[in-house]
């Protein structure tokens, strides 16, 4: 399981930054977490192992943010190695940027 090219990474980046994700917007950062979840679920590995992808709501968070994580279990021998895919999603308001905020 790997990204196939620079172009795919570029496409993913462009799609993610195009998502309105400021927390005061409807759904805020959750929309990005959902995008990541859907992306993972579209990969062949996770189609075969959908239980290894989760989207969860952050506890005690008045903005009701979400995060996504996934994990890939190793297949060589009985090493038991696992790769965990998780990242921090955070956005900030753009009001301070005035005319260049868009």
Could you say what each language-model-derived stretch is?
Residues 2-102:
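Acidic/His- and Gly-rich active-site-bordering loop/insert found
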């Amino acid at each position: 399981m790997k990204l196939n090219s620079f172009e795919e990474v570029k496409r993913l980046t462009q799609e993610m930054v195009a998502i309105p994700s400021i927390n005061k917007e409807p759904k805020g950062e959750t929309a990005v977490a959902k995008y990541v979840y859907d992306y993972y679920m579209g990969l062949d590995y996770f189609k075969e192992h959908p239980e290894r992808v989760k989207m969860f709501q952050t506890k005690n968070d008045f903005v009701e943010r979400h995060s996504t994580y996934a994990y890939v279990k190793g297949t060589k021998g009985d090493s038991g190695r696992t790769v965990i895919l998780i990242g921090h999603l955070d956005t900030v308001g753009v009001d301070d940027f005035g005319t260049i905020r868009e």
